[in-house]
From Swiss-Prot:
Coiled coil region boundaries: none
Subunit structure as annotated in this protein's UniProt entry: V-ATPase is a heteromultimeric enzyme made up of two complexes: the ATP-hydrolytic V1 complex and the proton translocation V0 complex. The V1 complex consists of three catalytic AB heterodimers that form a heterohexamer, three peripheral stalks each consisting of EG heterodimers, one central rotor including subunits D and F, and the regulatory subunits C and H. The proton translocation complex V0 consists of the proton transport subunit a, a ring of proteolipid subunits c9c'', rotary subunit d, subunits e and f, and the accessory subunits ATP6AP1/Ac45 and ATP6AP2/PRR.
Protein's name according to its UniProt entry: V-type proton ATPase subunit G 1
Species of provenance: Canis lupus familiaris
Pfam families: V-ATPase_G
């Protein structure tokens, strides 16, 4: 009986060691997967930064020529607005006088289509 008990104990210990090895293997696998995921994430982030930097440089090159153009358009717009404002200041009094003259100087007239009923 003692040999059977000893054999069972050996089997239980072997099963326990096997379970520990399987658990260790699972932990190592989980660590490797986590490390691979982190490395992949870092690589993706590095690639994204490179592409973003490349995009920024191309955009800067394209906008450099447009930057001068937009500055010229901005300056032309300012000149036109200043011209309109000065024209408004010059003609303001004359236009107000015309408007007030049309509103205040009413000349009563009979409408040409009006027929006098007899």
């Amino acid at each position: 009986m003692a040999s059977q008990s000893q054999g069972i104990q050996q089997l239980l210990q072997a099963e326990k060691r096997a379970a520990e090895k399987v658990a260790d293997a699972r932990k190592r696998k989980a660590r490797r997967l986590k490390q691979a995921k982190e490395e992949a994430q870092m690589e993706v982030e590095l690639y994204r930064r490179e592409r973003e930097q490349e995009f920024q440089s191309k955009q800067q090159a394209a906008m450099g020529s447009q930057g001068n153009l937009s500055a010229e358009v901005e300056q032309a717009t300012r000149r036109q607005v200043q011209g309109m404002q000065s024209s408004q200041q010059r003609n303001r009094e004359r236009v107000l006088a015309q408007l007030l003259g049309m509103v205040c100087d009413v000349r009563p007239q009979v409408h040409p289509n009006y027929r006098i009923a007899v």
